[in-house]
Amino acid sequence: MTAENGAQGAVSPSLNILAQYIKDLSFENPGAPRSLQGRENAPAININVNVNANPISGSDFDVVLTLNAEAKDGDKILFAAELVYGGVFRIAGFPQEHMLPVLFIECPRLLFPFARQIIADVTRNGGFPPLMIDPIDFSQMFAQRVAEEQAKAQVQAVPN
């Protein structure tokens, strides 16, 4: 009844994807068909990424990856795409101090290739070359988020 390492009833950490889904998908091509004509310069592309996680029940969590992409030629919007892509994850056996990194680094890392492909397909289907979003460093995003929350907490802790 004891494992070889001597731990009793130790549960090895597990991370399972129970479901993946598109929560919201929007593609706007306001200048079509003129926006589809060739242009001298490559458009300026701006991409914003956000990750949220919420408990569902027990060890199940809903992790949502939001990607917003906008292409501009000067001040004219060529296209705007928004994808809210979610996954339901069952997470068990991780120490409590590892839960936030699992939710905000590992889960979005698993969702990202699917979300990236959806954005590439929708931009291609909108008449543009597929937008292949560069890999995202979710670890760096998480570290930045933690630093911002700590700075915010320090500001709130300072008496007026």
From Swiss-Prot:
Source species, domain of life: Bacteria
Molecular function, one GO term: unfolded protein binding
The keyword Secreted belongs to this UniProt entry's keyword annotation: no
Compartments reported by the entry: Cytoplasm
InterPro entries found in the cross-reference section: SecB, SecB-like_sf
Function: One of the proteins required for the normal export of preproteins out of the cell cytoplasm. It is a molecular chaperone that binds to a subset of precursor proteins, maintaining them in a translocation-competent state. It also specifically binds to its receptor SecA.
Protein name: Protein-export protein SecB
